Amino acid sequence: MDVNLAPLRAWDDFFPGSDRFARPDFRDISKWNNRVVSNLLYYQTNYLVVAAMMISVVGFLSPFNMILGGVIVVLVFMGFVWAAHNKDILRRMKKQYPTAFVMVVMLASYFLISMFGGVMVFVFGITLPLLLMFIHASLRLRNLKNKLENKMEGIGLKKTPMGIILDALEQQEDNINKFADYISKARE
């Protein structure tokens, strides 16, 4: 299946006003995780544009450190995903605590980058865009169109870059399993 970039959402949909933002329920981690995953899939192109602008500014000021930081983060992420596929304890951690898994990847990347002296580039060029994405995805309430797009991604009708990353973090399998269970119950 071809990988397609999701459409760029309108600014008034991305930042509609305070009525479409709410604090997540920190007691219900699965509901909060579902909101974050749904928003990451739905607004992925908007997040990509915001991150690209921030990375471009930092990359313009310090291109070598930005490239080095990006390469280190990608290699550490791929290493942790590979290790999680081969070690059961890491796989469970990645599936149950995806935020902690990403934080471990970022901390490991930070320590590697600090050896090369590019800590400020890491903080402003890599960590800040990821933090802003996570905050927006946590606070933004989902709408009906968001939920419909996510179902299409979840059952495999569409494949996007963020969907591939979330699959690597094993954050979409539950949605597919729930949908398959729903269809099998509807047939009975």
UniProtKB/Swiss-Prot annotation:
The modification N-acetylmethionine is found at residue 1. Homodimer. Heterodimer with ARL6IP1. Forms multimers. Interacts with ARL6. Interacts with prenylated RAB1A and RAB3A. Interacts with SLC1A1/EAAC1. Interacts with RTN2 (via first transmembrane domain). Does not interact with VAMP1, VAMP2 or VAMP3. This is PRA1 family protein 3. The chain crosses the membrane at residues 40-60, 64-84, 93-113, 115-135. Induction: By methyl-beta-cyclodextrin. Up-regulated upon chronic morphine injection, in amygdala only, other brain regions remain unaffected. Induction by morphine may affect glutamate uptake in the amygdala, causing mice to develop morphine tolerance and dependence. Was originally reported to be induced by retinoic acid. The gene is Arl6ip5. Residues 1-39, 85-92, 136-188 are cytoplasmic. InterPro entries: Prenylated_rab_accept_PRA1. Residues 136-188 are annotated as: Targeting to endoplasmic reticulum membrane. Belongs to the PRA1 family. Signal peptide: none annotated. Residues 103-117 are annotated as: Required for homodimer formation and heterodimer formation with ARL6IP1. Pfam families: PRA1. It comes from Mus musculus (Mouse). It is a multi-pass membrane protein. One of its GO terms (biological process) is intrinsic apoptotic signaling pathway in response to oxidative stress. It is found in: Endoplasmic reticulum membrane; Cell membrane; Cytoplasm; Cytoplasm, Cytoskeleton. Keywords: Acetylation, Cell membrane, Cytoplasm, Cytoskeleton, Endoplasmic reticulum, Membrane, Transmembrane, Transmembrane helix. GO terms for cellular component: cytoskeleton; endoplasmic reticulum membrane; plasma membrane; presynaptic cytosol. Regulates intracellular concentrations of taurine and glutamate. Negatively modulates SLC1A1/EAAC1 glutamate transport activity by decreasing its affinity for glutamate in a PKC activity-dependent manner. Plays a role in the retention of SLC1A1/EAAC1 in the endoplasmic reticulum. Expressed in the cerebral cortex, cerebellum, hippocampus, olfactory bulbs, medulla oblongate and limbic system (at protein level). Ubiquitous.
